[in-house]
A protein has these predicted regions:
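Secretory targeting and sorting signals
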Residues: 1-30
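Extended beta-solenoid/beta-helix repeat architectures
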Residues: 22-23, 28-216
């Protein structure tokens, strides 16, 4: 009896120590934050995977060849996303090219956007002057798009698009207003909820929902 009573506290103490050790070990390491100083006239290359980059200064060309990186950056003349699975938050950008897959970009405005990497997500709170999408399963969400060219199988959502040309197939486009719409691809779905749209449909099996202007 005596030896049994002495063993119980030892077992309880061992269980408590094991629990404490498990709590003390972190479940997952946090990605390091790496400050990067941009300089005018030089190309800034971000090549390390799984790193959080904090860019500062005046950026010219920024090239992201890393995978699964997080980038916070000021305005730049050109952004190239070659890696995969990156997340970029930027100030206004002039030219953007996305060739890697599964990247995400958030910015106030873009002058030229070219996307060929599959599964890209681009969110622009303001104006996109020119958007060319030739990928698959990519998404562009913007306030206003001046010229949109869809050559792959992607999706575009905007409040206003002035000129939209769809040469690819299986695209999904949702616009509040659209001035001109030209389709030569097949099986595209386009919805325009307000205003009048000049339409030319030379494709096959396209689903178009173009609602007339509301009378006052």
């Amino acid at each position: 009896m005596t030896s049994r009573h002495r063993a119980l506290p030892v077992l309880a103490l061992t269980a408590g120590l094991t629990s404490a050790l498990l709590v003390a070990v972190p479940a997952q390491a946090v990605a390091p934050v790496l400050p990067v100083q941009c300089e005018v006239g030089t190309e800034t290359v971000l090549a390390w995977d799984d790193v959080a980059y904090d860019l500062r200064g005046t950026c010219g060309v920024v090239r992201v060849s890393a995978d699964h990186a997080t980038v916070t950056m000021p305005a730049a003349t050109r952004l190239v996303l070659e890696g995969a699975g990156n997340t970029v938050t930027a100030k206004p950008l002039l030219d953007v090219e996305v060739t890697g897959a599964g990247n995400g970009l958030t910015t106030p405005s873009v002058r030229s956007l070219v996307v060929s990497g599959a599964g890209t997500t681009v969110t622009v709170s303001g104006l996109v002057e020119l958007a060319e999408l030739s990928s698959t399963s990519s998404t562009l969400t913007a306030d206003v798009v001046n010229v949109a060219r869809l050559r792959g199988a992607d999706a575009v959502t905007a409040r206003k698009a002035y000129r939209t040309r769809i040469t690819g197939s299986d695209n999904v486009v949702g616009l509040r207003r659209a001035d001109k719409l030209v389709l030569t691809g097949d099986r595209n779905a386009v919805t325009v909820t307000r205003g009048r749209t000049t339409l030319r449909d030379g494709g096959d099996s396209n689903v178009l929902d173009l609602r007339p202007r509301r009378r006052r």
